Design a protein with these regions (language model features):
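Adenine nucleotide-associated cytosolic modules
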Residues: 2-7, 11-368
Length: 368
């Protein structure tokens, strides 16, 4: 039966459905334009670029100061599918620099809180939260679907794992980090640019690298680093990434920006020899819950000698430390845990039986 519209116009049912669908498309287009209008008029983005973002998937590994800011920017830019992976919970010390969280989020999983806030910020996108430790057993399954991966981690072990996954599966990713008043960013395109291990062949010995917990961090630098990293991720998604390999270093206190050329290592074990040792189960850290002791032992897979006296000097500013030439004992006055660290990197974390909590403590105070 024909439908009679205003002004006496007749329309068949099939034509009516077409009109409804057309009207829906117009409304949807208006909605998208209203949300993304400032990006759509950019010659670097435009309608084709915005469509590409909406059909893209990005995973953010780590939801600390850098990762949460990158996630926020990607969601508001309209990346269609986001996945955030983080094993930790929101702590009071996070609020100084992790702008996605507030006091009402304390003790909640970071990935869960972040995903809920991003859904409220942009209901047009899909956001997945994975409250897990990224490790060699799950990394390929978790990261394998992404078009781009953004680094928001706090330790080199996980970064080397991400580098292995991305190189093996040819997934572009953006390495970044911030500590003190400076940060660095390097976009990595498998088969095009050097990989992370061309730049850093091996994980530095435990206790050598600075961490935010030991060196501090000015809350402005993670936001700047995340903005640069997110821009690099968007360029990759749009096929407009730079083809020359570069490491971007920014010091927010001195207001200096450097770009360093990174050269591919012709003997790189990862991107040249295809040795993905951080995906090798035989080479992963050994983590053991100690029976009857309310403690977890962590034995690093890679041998190294920790400078206990130097690390003790750093830890002394934030807790109680005792050390000799063989061991270091550290007590955090704000928590119940106690860490005994040995020269070879082995540690016993007392006050928890949770392997993930122990790994988090180890990564925080014994930088890797």
């Amino acid at each position: 039966m024909d439908l009679i519209l205003a002004f006496g116009t007749k329309m068949a049912p099939n034509d009516c459905h077409k009109l409804v669908n057309a009207n829906f498309s117009v409304v949807s287009a208006r909605h998208e334009y209203a949300r993304y209008s400032r990006q759509l008029i950019l010659p670097e983005i435009g309608t084709e670029g915005q469509s590409a973002l909406q059909n893209s998937s990005v995973s953010v590994v780590g939801c600390g100061a850098t990762g949460s800011t990158a996630l926020n920017l990607l969601a508001r830019a309209g990346v269609g599918e986001l996945t955030v992976i983080d094993r930790d919970f929101v702590e009071l010390t996070n609020l100084q620099r992790q702008v996605l969280f507030d006091e009402g989020d304390l003790d909640l999983p970071k990935a869960l809180v972040a995903s809920e806030k991003m859904r409220r910020a942009n209901s047009d996108i899909v956001v997945h939260d994975i409250i897990k430790d990224l490790n060699l057993n799950n990394a390929e399954d978790i990261l394998g679907h992404a078009d781009v991966i953004v680094d928001g981690t706090d330790n080199m072990e996980t970064r080397f794992l991400v580098n292995d996954v991305c190189t093996k599966h040819e997934i572009p990713w953006v390495y970044c980090g911030a500590v003190g008043t400076h940060g660095m960013v390097m976009p990595i395109i498998p088969r095009t640019t050097p990989c992370l291990r061309c730049f850093i062949p091996n994980i530095p010995p435990q206790g050598v690298l600075q961490t935010c917990d030991l060196a501090g961090v000015l809350n402005t630098i993670p936001t700047i680093v995340a903005s640069i990293a997110t821009t690099e991720a968007i360029r990759i998604l749009l096929g407009k990434q730079a083809t020359d390999a570069k490491l971007i270093i920014y010091d927010v206190w001195e207001q200096t920006l450097q770009k360093m050329a990174v050269v591919k290592d012709p003997s790189c074990r990862c991107c040249v020899e295809s040795e993905f040792e951080f995906l090798d189960a035989k080479k992963g850290d050994k983590i053991t819950t100690l029976c009857g002791r309310d403690a977890v032992q962590i034995t690093p897979a890679r041998e190294g000698t920790i400078k206990l006296a130097e690390l003790a000097g750093n830890l002394d500013r934030i807790g109680q430390v005792k050390h000799n030439e063989y061991t270091l004992l550290f007590k955090d006055p704000h928590t119940d845990f106690e860490m005994t660290l040995f020269r070879d990197g082995r540690a016993i974390i007392k006050g928890t039986r949770d392997p993930e909590a122990a790994k988090s403590i180890y990564a925080r105070y014994v930088a890797r």
